Amino acid sequence: MEAGLLWFCNWSTLGVCAALKLPQIYAQLAARSARGISLPSLLLELAGFLVFLRYQHYYGNPLLTYLEYPILIAQDIVLLLFVFHFNGNVKQALPYMAVFVSSWFILSLQKWIIDLAMNLCTVISAASKFAQLQYLWKVQDSGAVSALTWGLSAYTCATRIITTLMTTNDLTILIRFVIMLALNIWVTATVLHYRKSATKAE
């Protein structure tokens, strides 16, 4: 029973994450706009994913418990490039990419660096969700933001809570997923609220 649940959680998370950002990318392409998408939120999310992936790799945790992160990072990079494209400043992406690539190597130079970064990772990831929430509250329009993407993110956090409890039982990782689950649900609800408000206004 436990092995079956672990298998389902791992593979359903990988399946969901393989297409997680596609609704967001599609919504952005259909709108030909980055309206509603917070650039700081996206950059913070990418930083959080990078730190989390490096931490899991550094400590040799089971590959299936974090295999979705390279997929998520690749999708976030595509999304980020589209945001820069639709905002008319693609060249500004280069310094960010240089920082992210160099960070990958710096994070594993010393154990204390990766441990500190992982503790800050939860704060960084939470800040990315709050940046998106703040932007939605400010513009009161969900624009090209995909509720499906945020809802699927909540699902993956829930499954990762289960897999963490069943494998590594790492408290730092567990706390991160619980906080991210709550915030992803909050963002999803906010996107749906503003979508409903926009429909009523029309």
Curated annotation (Swiss-Prot):
Keyword entries, A-Z: Membrane, Signal, Transmembrane, Transmembrane helix
Gene expressing this chain: Slc66a3
Region forming the signal peptide: 1-19
Top-level lineage group: Eukaryota
CC annotations in GO: membrane
Species name: Mus musculus
Name of this chain's protein: Solute carrier family 66 member 3
Disulphide bond pairs: none
Subcellular location: Membrane
Membrane topology listed for this record: Multi-pass membrane protein
Keyword tRNA-binding in annotation: no
Transmembrane segments: 33-53, 64-84, 94-114, 171-191
InterPro entries listed in its UniProt record: MannP-dilichol_defect-1, PQ-loop_rpt
